[in-house]
Amino acid sequence: MAKSSTIFTAVLFLFLLWSCEKQAPVCTGNCASITANGKVINNLSGDGAANIPVTLQWQRFVGLAQEQLVIESVMSSEAGEFDFSANIDTAYFRKGYELGLKVRSGGDYIILGSTGKIDARAYEYDTSAFHGITFDVFRKAKLIIRLHRVQTDDFKNFVISHGVFGGTNGYDYSVSSPKEVIDRNQYELNVNTVSDVYTKIKVEKIAINGTANVRVDSVRCSASGTTYFDVNF
């Protein structure tokens, strides 16, 4: 399998791992109070971002999987601020957990792991560990990539990815043969990207003989409507 397809599989696998979480048990021993406060801002404008989920959780890796135990989750205020307290069982530190405070995508905004601050961590009990935290989110724009299979060539890999600020934020489509295009029967890709900046779209096709044909385009999307981008292949 081509390298790009392998990357796509790995990214999808990690996403599924990170999406698995449970509620933390109610503290019954070794209980201590911790307060988290700060602000969620639009990274591009500096304005507060409302109705964004902020989560306090225990987390640790078990093999390749990250175990996440949610202690408390709140939404940022209209001004983007958050301020809450929770009881935690400090014995979890001795069990190999770290305490994490995270911001998530929500409402009109998305997070980017490659740009901006999206989490804070504590490895021991510290009442001020999560004071004055600023998290970054980006105004969301909707991009639809429309696929048109107009050629009759054979290939062993075809991948579409997108990114902003010079990085790759998502592998949106990956097939290993023309037959898989037909079998999948998916010709519109719904992509959430960042508003008012250029989104790079990379289209890579690898022929049977190993020759790579790479096309890179950019499109500027707006939060006020849907942007369409057509790919003929």
Kindly give the residue locations of the regions a language model identified.
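Sec-dependent bacterial lipoprotein signal peptides
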Residues: 1-20
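Beta-strand-rich domain onsets/edges
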Residues: 20-35, 39-44, 129-140
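Solvent-exposed, conformationally flexible loop/turn segments
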Residues: 31, 120-130, 138, 176-186, ...
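Post-signal-peptide N-terminal segment of Sec-exported extracytoplasmic proteins
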Residues: 35-81
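Short, ordered, surface-exposed loop/turn motifs in non-cytosolic proteins
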Residues: 45-64, 151-171
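Short, acidic Ser/Thr/Gly-rich low-complexity loop/linker segments typical of extracellular
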Residues: 63-86, 169-184
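Short Pro-Gly-centered beta-turn/loop motif in secreted/extracellular proteins
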Residues: 78-99, 179-202
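A short, solvent-exposed loop/turn motif at the edges and junctions
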Residues: 90-126, 204-214
